């Protein structure tokens, strides 16, 4: 093959490569704009349809929240996990408000009906959201924080930074105490290729994972519909990807140690069949929070929050009631560790 022929082949190869790259770039760009923005008109429509509650403008964007219960009741704040927004707490409002508590749940940035700022979606962003939200809705109040999965890490980090605001912690299958090796997640963390996968296929991936969780929910169809609705708007996949890359999902031990050094009451609830945040990590948690009360359940997994809401809300009410006991009427205390079969 002569020099001219070699040059022709190289030019053809470069042309094909450039064409493929352009196609990939255009598909990436188009996929990012295939869904509408979550703007004021979209939120108004959600409220009119009875799908959303209240909104508030905070430093990094608009936040969707639900606040119910007696105005003078102790404030209980419910913090959701990595991908499922605040609807995961829907079954907790009735029992907790009936017990006299004011209950607040909200969508973290990038989830549910809250804004999708550019990020990074790290611990500082979620912490600032909660700081700003409490300053706006409950200034100068002490709160009882309840966190599920990544929300467990969020409330623990908050307690380690703002100890004077937190009366108690309830941690349900809390993340932040060790990483679970997953080749798929490691692939998503890689620059460029992870961005492209999430932009092109991320919503299908997240829907598939939610569909598995929904099978055990009391109302699977309702759960999946509520989960999918947040994906109707631009930015959800990118928010989760940024969280995977920048949030200390497996490396929050220092915050647990700081929060655990306090005399603040802590309750931990965990399913021993949890494959997302393995129950084995409870050993590390109890070493960092030796005064915590641990309740574990052999047959339940990571979805214990929404599959066993009656059980979990009952434990929460019992725990919170113990904080309200009068000095001359001591509350019934649980053993530091309790395992239920």
PLM regions and their residue ranges:
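Short beta-strand/loop motif that positions the catalytic acidic residue
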Residues: 262, 268-270, 274
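Catalytic active-site module of serine/aspartate enzymes centered on a nucleophile-bearing elbow/loop
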Residues: 292-341
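Alpha/beta-hydrolase fold catalytic core
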Residues: 2-74, 98-101, 253, 321-341
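Conserved alpha/beta-hydrolase catalytic His-Asp/Glu region
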Residues: 33-35, 185-186, 199-261
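Active-site loop/oxyanion-hole signature of alpha/beta-hydrolase fold enzymes
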Residues: 52-61, 66, 98, 108-146, ...
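Conserved HGGG/HGGXW glycine-rich cap/lid loop of the alpha/beta-hydrolase fold
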Residues: 61, 68-113
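Flexible "cap/lid" loop of the alpha/beta hydrolase fold
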Residues: 160, 168-199
